[in-house]
Design a protein with these regions (language model features):
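Boundary at the C-terminal end of the N-terminal hydrophobic targeting segment
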Residues: 17-19
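Acidic, Ser/Thr/Gly/Pro-rich low-complexity segments and short DxT(G/T)-type signature motifs
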Residues: 86-115
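Surface-exposed, short loops/turns at beta-strand junctions within beta-sandwich domains
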Residues: 83-91, 192-198
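Carboxylate/His-rich catalytic cores and anion/metal-binding grooves
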Residues: 338-362
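Aromatic (Trp/Tyr) and acidic
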Residues: 21-56, 69-78, 121-122, 128-206, ...
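Acidic, glycine-anchored loop motifs typical of Ca2+
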Residues: 328-342
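Low-complexity, Pro/Ser/Thr- and charge-rich linker/hinge segments at domain boundaries
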Residues: 107-129, 210-248
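Bacterial N-terminal signal peptides
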Residues: 6-14
Length: 689
């Protein structure tokens, strides 16, 4: 589950360990702190005993202080911090502990220093500003400032052996100050002069070195590929098999049969008797670690379509190894249908709602079951799924999405375009009718989406008048763009609801309306740019934003900035996007990459049913899952120090364990949707077939 870079960090160790506790690595946490990393097959955060500091000796002398941190992981990770006199390059150290004796020669070019936080996967070459952070944290010893002169640093290119090679650049770390969001005393390492390529490593004088990292090139290409394909892996109603996956873990189509129960909307409480009428439906996505399909998921195809409109040159067919040729039952026949993969993915996310639509145009809110599917591949699904209630919000959103897809797909398939356009009007009329019956108006969000897309496709004058008259409504995006994505199912604004109008030819648009939409987008961008500057780490999350996954939702937060960069070409916009997207890949207080299978400090146990199966098979978790990450104050999961709402900074409130859905689950619409398009844009498209 975890990569140990012994070749790169060149530790010389003699190891003895108990049957339960296994010694893994010597690290540093400061220029006078040696860190010992143990893993245990027992989930006991008090297993490592430091109550007698005299038993922890370095070169025969008791450590000046002994601190620790422990947390549930796989099964338990334990980090012991030994404060010693200032470390000296070339000096040999013998460490005696109650759990064994270890020897190493300190070399700051070889030993890993956990205080250095980098993007462990790929910094974007499009950005002119890149950085790493540095912060000392000693578990129950708390955070620590650097005393005395600030150290220098050097960036080296690594040789194939993992040893440092050519010097790339150097400088001195810069003090940022104490950060409220993380609790850290933060220092900055400027990487702006590091050119495209890699692998590189940062060496901080007297402290140690970072994890390796790359800039652009194949590193960004791999990130783009893995991130985009997270959507494919989350598809419902399809096999996930070789050669379209590194391993075949779902050999049967799943969740095709839906029982028409029309039950109330609720989490895991829908009882299916098995005698109800059924329909067959393919497409859409599993919600998260479970398999329900929900209205919120329409933000995925909406975002994919907008991204293709804005950056068509970056997306092609046969780009992401996604099957796109099927028989009538959606058995895979091959790929290469001549349609860009991003539009194939958009169709998969859209077509479920086509199959789910009633004859009168209404659409149920989604599918649900009673309880949860077992933690294994959906080949072994043992739950029946039924439809939730018919909901006008669903048909309202679908009316805009159907027209959006119909317009974009028309050059590739006119018949399919016509079908979706007809369904769009059917959905819109059903929604208006149902809202009227309930003495309510259709939300402005969906009204705008429908009217913009229908006007751009058909030239309908009445739709255009609506768009012009209500353009100011879009300013509400400023207050909703960074909220929990459930709000997009009614009052929350997506850029997709109006951005197509901005991109349309001037001959088809009204200048005042375009300006109103651009003003709304600009105000949103300005707000997020300010939020980016609030915290020392590039998470861009205001302190009052606290929904599940909000601290790793940089894709959602940066998407309006990406679109403004498209319109203006301003370098400052892509710089901020790039820096914020570094956060989830390791440039965070925990130094953890929250996207599965990438980076060096990886997520052990995503709360994901099919990953439980792939891990059991020895393949590791399914690739590209961006878990919720830190920020939710979990209960009843072992950790030391105990995670507390009153004392633990939000960016350190994280435990990596399967059952911890607050930290280690994810959703298709919150976690995977936006990064799946932002990372390919930062890579300049994906071309490394």
């Amino acid at each position: 589950m975890r990569t140990i870079l012994t070749a790169i960090f060149g530790l010389f160790l003699t190891i003895s360990a108990s049957a339960k506790l296994t010694f893994r690595e010597i690290r540093t946490a400061a220029d006078n702190v040696i860190e010992l990393f143990y893993v245990s097959d027992t989930l006991d955060v008090n297993e490592v005993d430091i109550s007698d500091p005299a038993q922890w000796k370095v070169n025969g002398q008791p450590a000046l202080a002994v601190n620790r941190i422990a947390a549930a992981a796989d099964q338990c990770d334990n980090f012991i911090y030994l404060t010693v006199p200032t470390l000296e390059n070339g000096k040999k150290y013998t460490i005696d502990t109650p759990y064994g004796s270890y020897k190493f020669k300190f070399n700051d070019k070889e030993v890993f220093c956990e205080a250095i936080k980098t993007n462990q996967v790929a910094y974007s070459a499009l950005s002119t500003k890149r950085f790493a952070n540095m912060a000392i944290y000693l578990g129950d010893g708390g955070t620590r400032k650097i005393e005395g002169a600030l150290p220098g640093y050097t960036v080296y290119k690594l040789k194939k052996s993992g040893k440092v090679g050519k010097k790339i650049c150097s400088g001195q770390v810069k003090e940022i100050g104490q950060d409220r969001s993380s609790g850290d005393f933060v220092y900055r390492i400027d990487l702006s002069q590091v050119p495209e390529g890699g692998l590189y490593k940062i060496v901080v004088d007297g402290y140690g070195s970072s994890y390796p990292f790359g800039v652009g090139s194949d590193f960004s290409q791999k990130l783009a590929y893995v991130s985009f394909r997270s959507l494919f892996n989350q598809r419902c109603g399809i096999q996930i098999i070789e050669p379209y996956s590194d391993f075949s873990y779902r050999t049967k189509r799943c969740h095709e049969t839906i029982y028409q129960t029309y039950d109330r909307i609720g989490e895991a409480r829908l009882v299916v008797k098995g005698t109800e009428p059924t329909i067959q439906a393919w497409g859409g996505y599993h919600d998260a670690g479970d398999a329900d399909r929900r209205t919120y998921h329409m933000d995925v195809p909406s975002t994919l379509l907008t991204t293709y409109e804005a950056f068509p040159e970056l997306f092609t067919d046969n780009q992401f190894n996604i099957p796109d040729i099927f028989d009538e039952q959606f058995n895979i026949l091959g790929k290469g249908n001549g349609i860009p993969d991003i539009l194939d993915e958009a169709e998969w996310g859209t077509m479920f709602w086509k199959y789910f639509q009633e004859e009168d145009g209404q659409i149920p809110w989604g599918t649900e079951t009673n309880g949860y599917s077992p933690f294994t591949t959906y080949d072994f699904e043992d739950h029946l799924f039924g439809s939730e209630t018919l909901d006008p919000r669903t048909s309202a959103w679908a009316s805009g999405l159907f027209y959006h897809f119909a317009r974009i797909i028309k050059p590739f398939d006119e018949a399919k375009s016509a079908e979706y356009a007809a369904r769009a009007d059917l959905a819109y009329n059903a929604s208006v009718r149902t809202y009227a019956e309930r003495n309510r108006e259709m939300p402005a969000t969906f009204c705008m989406y429908y009217n913009v897309e229908k006007y751009l496709m058909t030239g309908d004058a009445e739709c255009h008048e609506y768009v012009k008259a209500h353009a100011a409504d879009a300013m509400q995006i400023v207050d909703t763009y960074n909220q929990g994505s459930e709000i997009f199912a009614e009052r929350g604004w997506l850029t997709s609801y109006f951005f197509s109008y901005i991109l349309a030819p001037e001959s088809k648009t009204d200048a005042a309306t375009v300006k109103a939409f651009k003003d709304a987008l600009q105000a949103t961008v300005d707000k997020q740019m300010a939020a980016f500057l609030e915290n020392a780490y590039p998470n861009g999350t205001p302190m009052n934003v606290t929904w599940w996954g909000s601290n790793v939702a940089q894709g959602q937060y940066t998407y309006p900035i990406v679109l403004m960069w498209k319109l203006t070409g301003k370098q400052e916009y892509i710089d901020v996007v790039s820096q914020m997207m570094d956060y989830a890949l390791g440039l965070n207080p925990l130094g953890k990459c929250f996207m599965t299978t990438l980076g060096y400090n990886q997520v052990h146990w995503p709360h994901d049913r099919e990953s439980a199966y792939t891990i059991e098979q020895g393949w590791g978790p399914r690739p590209g899952i961006l878990v919720f990450g830190p920020g939710n104050y979990v209960r009843n999961y072992p950790s030391y120090p105990v995670i507390s709402r009153n004392s633990t900074p939000r960016e350190r409130a994280y435990i990596d364990i399967l059952d911890n859905y607050q930290n280690n689950e994810y959703t298709i619409y919150q976690s995977l949707c936006f990064p799946s398009v932002v990372y390919p844009i930062l890579a300049g498209g994906y071309t490394s077939h």
